[in-house]
Amino acid sequence: MRIALGIEYNGTNYFGWQRQREVKSVQEELEKALSVVANHPVEVQCAGRTDAGVHGTGQVVHFDTNVSRKMVAWTMGANANMPSDIAVRWAVEVNDDFHARFSATARRYRYIIFNHALRPGILNSGVSHYHGELDEKKMHEAGQYLLGENDFSSFRAAHCQSLSPCRNMMHLNVTRHGDYIVIDIKANAFVHHMVRNITGSLIKVGRGEEKPEWIKSLLEAKDRKLAGATAKAEGLYLVDVDYPEEFGLPRVPIGPLFLPDNLN
């Protein structure tokens, strides 16, 4: 039997999603909790591995088990055995051909910037703070140069293990909500640090150091050294993963918190 789960987590206290020796990971905590419910060792596969400090509201995983449990046992049981900063949002039985990573058709991230002169006290690890003025309209304009199928070498981490730097960017929207700026990005997949490197470059445009057209020149240059600095992990959320409707996965609000699904 194959089970799919929707996972939400605050990544602040973890060294990323992936299980690692001698450090805390979201995957390890989830697997330990599921193993208690299943009464056998459980290993999960995820839609996307997030880095240290990165959060998730829409992570999807799957695992196989030979025990019969009601779906509420996987949600309530796992949550009862996990730290309070990780939660299972839903559980469904899926066909054996479903794979959390390889069945996914798109991933969506949101990066939240608190744009204010003073740092926040609440949500300080859930947003990235930038004290200077940012022009979100110019940031949005710049982001439109990234749409479509492109080589994202200029926004790819030096140690990225992906075989190809090419990805299909489906949308990139930058909107302001009071003192908060939200960068909403969706693509078929992402190279390592792609969202944070794009964000760092958009910030340079937003503060007037570069014109929106500069983003186009970065794409063409295919040189990471020319782009902006990697933005901090704190403001980044994996909020949604798309799958073919045939798998019947639940649709839930993507957030984080009170943010609506559509910010336009």
Swiss-Prot record:
InterPro entries: PsdUridine_synth_cat_dom_sf (IPR020103), PsdUridine_synth_TruA (IPR001406), PsdUridine_synth_TruA_a/b_dom (IPR020097), PsdUridine_synth_TruA_C (IPR020095), TruA/RsuA/RluB/E/F_N (IPR020094)
Keyword Coiled coil belongs to the record: no
Record Gene3D superfamilies: Pseudouridine synthase I, catalytic domain, C-terminal subdomain (3.30.70.660), Pseudouridine synthase I, catalytic domain, N-terminal subdomain (3.30.70.580)
Range of residues in the leader sequence: none
Chemical reaction(s) catalysed: uridine(38/39/40) in tRNA = pseudouridine(38/39/40) in tRNA
Coiled-coil annotated spans: none
Active site as annotated: 51 (nucleophile)
Alphabetical keyword list: Isomerase, tRNA processing
One Gene Ontology term from the biological process aspect of the record: tRNA pseudouridine synthesis
EC number, as in UniProt: 5.4.99.12
Membrane-spanning segments: none
Record keyword Iron-sulfur present: no
Uppermost EC category: isomerase
Gene Ontology MF terms: RNA binding; tRNA pseudouridine(38-40) synthase activity
Annotated residues for binding of substrate: 109
Family to which the UniProt record says this protein belongs: Belongs to the tRNA pseudouridine synthase TruA family.
Complexes and interactors: Homodimer.
Function text: Formation of pseudouridine at positions 38, 39 and 40 in the anticodon stem and loop of transfer RNAs.
UniProt xrefs under HAMAP family: TruA
Protein name: tRNA pseudouridine synthase A
Organism field: Vibrio campbellii (strain ATCC BAA-1116)
Lineage: Bacteria, Pseudomonadati, Pseudomonadota, Gammaproteobacteria, Vibrionales
